[in-house]
Structures are given as structure tokens and as C-alpha cells.
Amino acid sequence: MLTTPFTRSDWEAKAAALKPEGRAFIDGRYVPALSGKTFTKTSPIDGRVIAEVADCGAEDIEAAVKAARTAFEDGRWRLKPPAEKKRILLRFAELVRADLEHLALLETLDVGKVIGNSLAVDVPFCADCIQYYAEFADKSFDEVAPTGPNDLAIVRREPLGVIGAIVPWNYPLIITAWKIGPALVAGNCVVLKPAEQSPLSALRLGELARQAGLPDGVLNVVPGFGEKAGKPLALHQDVDMISFTGSTEVGKLMLRYAGESNMKRVALECGGKSPHVVLADADLDAAASGIAWGIYYNQGETCHAGSRVIAHASIKDELVRKIGEVAAQQIPLGHPLDPAAQMGALVEKGHMERVLSYIDIGTREGATIAHGGSRVMAETGGYYVEATILDGVEPQHRVAREEIFGPVVVVSTFTDENEALRMANDSIYGLAAAVWTGNMNAAHRFTSGIRAGTVWVNCFDRSSLATPFGGFRQSGFGRDRSPHAIEKYMDFKTVWTAYS
């Protein structure tokens, strides 16, 4: 269980003293929205006000894009020697690490995730990601193509220009780093639009980047709502790429906006409905642990959460019992500033109501609640839902097909492998999957047959910055993480020279 050196009361005292920055970060400084408007950011932990945030619109996006374009064209970042880029980005990573408690508290207050995870996972992973990509600054080479003896063809990789990065609220720091790390090391300038539910840590990153030596205009952070700020960014004629993580519905809008504007490049990481296929010979203790942590971690607010269990009929009942035991014994729901809590608050009231509505839909469709199923801790003023198991779910049920994005796992059964594979692939999504079995031949058949960007065998949610992350089908295209992510922020130029 994650622990911290502070008690809940210590963190509450720190939270009471915190004065988060809510202004936009444009061209190296904090500025109010040009309209003067703000919106009130409340914490899902208890509903209290934590900041007034700049309610940015098209005019602020215009200012940020102009700053980024100017910085790109004059070469203040693009033309820096690789060793200097590396030094600045490594310094950026170190400043993130040094700001651990501050960033972790912002993240927890903003979105309701537990402080232990913000400290041990979100902030360190953000720093590690920036460091990982910094190391590529002086290790990436152009290529010489094999041509005739009197020709020289150099294949160069060049930055795209201005990148619009739109990130979601579930992992603000981590997903921001997934985007700005490779984009910056490639030599681009970035306009970052955090989700309106989670602007505070991204705004802090802007200042840390400035302290690290990143030139003005290279990283801009513009908070605001999707329709007012995200849409103008995606439609902007001077933005060369949109890198988006969020819902499939909005991802489709990004494609439309790209076509309606300048045919900018688009990379999408969208929704998921990841299946666990549990064969009859699986280690049920290991499977139950992987399933429980894979859906209840971060309150189920994870795009690749293992939200579907497809279990062999002979072991289903025992598996369901074991999942419930893991949830009850190892993943306590509690106040997010309590270091002992492993599940916290859902991000906002509307989202909590949506999750609860899906539990109701599932029971009306014929499923039974095998564990949890209710709102709890309502007296806090926050938005908490129990770890929930819906059993007896059929593949055609809405809860088996639609992304709930909360602490709800649905359980269905199969009797033969072909049926299980069909069920696993019976989804518009293809982000991730897992197969649990002691038979490696069966595991190979499933890893080959499942249409998903990541497939785990006898584990779940193992990850590394060295491995690409992204999905098939309506889970999107393009990959975050790994060296492969850098190339999506670059273009290829071939330079021919003829010799006599």
C-alpha cells in the first residue's frame, strides 16, 4: 500500500495554505484571459473552491499560437544545439521532481485521485517521461539512403512546427508529459490545452519549464472549455498538428476540424472497453488481483481500464468472489488526502451521476450487483462510488459495450475459445486487453487474435516508457511513449545532391 510521510491532517493543512495559479501561461508569463473572465474550480473531494481559472477563448488561443509560431520560426528552440536542448529538458525533469509535493497536491485536489498515487506515480512518471525524451536530443540521426554512386540522398527529420496538445483530466501530468516530451525534443513549440476539470498542474508545469530555461513561447498553457478553447485550437490555420487524448466522440471532432482547416496532422488516443479473458486453467488469485487493480485503480477513470471480464463458465463464480475480496481487502475507498486510501473521488458530480446511471442500466438489463454498486461518503460533499461488480452481463448489454469510465467491471461467460475471442473483439474499441491462462499456446492464439494496441498475458497494466501506447479502431491512432512517439511530431525531408 502506498504511504507518505504525512497524515491526512498534514495534507489538509497544506491544501488550506495552497494558492494555485489559475492564469494562462503564454509567451513565458502568466496572463489573465483577454476577456477577463474566469471560472471557479472546485475540488471533487469535498466541493470546496480551490482556484479561479482563466476562462480562455479564441482570442487567447490566437495569442498562444502566435507566440508559439514566432518562437518556432525564429529558431530560439528549434535551432538550439542538441546538447543544450537536452540540458534544458533534463533540468525541467529535475524541477518537476523537486516540486513533488506541490504538484501531487494540485493533482489530487483537482481531480480527486488519492495523494499516495499522485506522489508515487503521477509526478514521478511525468518527470521520468520528460527525462526519457530529453536523452534523445543528441541521439537521433538523419539517414543516408542507398542510391547510385554519384548521388547523395539524405533523409532528414524536421519538426512540424506548432503542436496543439489537448489532454484529459484523468492523468493530467502523465499525459501532458507523453505529449510535450517528444514534441519538444523534436524541436516543436506547443500550445497545451488542459481539460477544464484539471488545469492546475499543467499551469504549474509552464512555470517550471520557464525556470528550466525553455525559451518564451515554446510551451504555452491555455486553460478553458472545449468548445471555447479546444475547438479554436483544433481549427487554427497556424497549428500544424493536434495531439488529442480524450473521448472517441471528441476525437472524431478533431478529425473534422483538421479537415475544415489546414489538413493538420492528427494523433488520437481515445476510449476503451478493455477485456480480460480468463480461461479455465488460469491462476484465479493472480487474475482477480489483476482485474481488481486494473479497474479500481484511479477510480476506474483510466482509458485502458480492464472494464470487461470474459470468464470461462466453470470458474466465473469463484473469480467474481475473489475480485470482490481483493477490492474489499486491498483497495479501500477513502478521503483522497488520507495516505491509506487507494480509491478516491470521481472527477465531478455529473460524472458520478453518469457512472451511477450505468449501474442502474446494468441491473435493468438483467445484471446483478455482486459487489458495491452505490454512492458513498455523500456527507463529505464529494463524489464517491464504491468498487462495483456487475455479474451476468450479456455481450449486447450497454454496460458491456459503452465506456463507463468509473469503478465498474462487468462479467460475462464463455464456454469455448472461439466464443471468447469473438466476445473480446466485439467492441468499437481496441485499446488494450489481457488473457489469463497457464497454457502459453492458448495465450499466443489470443494475443495474435485480439485487436488491441496492448495485450497483456497473466498481468495487467505493465508499462514502460520504452513501449508504445495507443489503440486500434475507434480507440484512435498514433502512439504515445517510446521512441516511435517522436516521429509523429516530425516530418521527413529528402535532400538530393548529384555529383559528377
Could you describe each region identified by the protein language model?
Residues 32-34, 38-39, 54-59, 282:
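A short acidic/small-residue loop/turn micro-motif
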Residues 48-51, 239, 277, 343, ...:
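Conserved C-terminal structural/oligomerization subdomain of aldehyde/semialdehyde dehydrogenase
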Residues 241, 249-394, 423, 457:
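ALDH superfamily catalytic-core signature
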Residues 1-46, 71:
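Hydrophobic face of amphipathic alpha-helices that form TPR/SEL1-like repeat modules
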Residues 48-140:
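Glycine-rich loop-to-alpha-helix module at the N-terminal edge of alpha/beta enzyme cores
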Residues 189-191, 369, 454:
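A short hydrophobic/small-residue beta-strand
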Residues 47, 85, 107, 187, ...:
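Residue-level signal for inorganic ion chemistry
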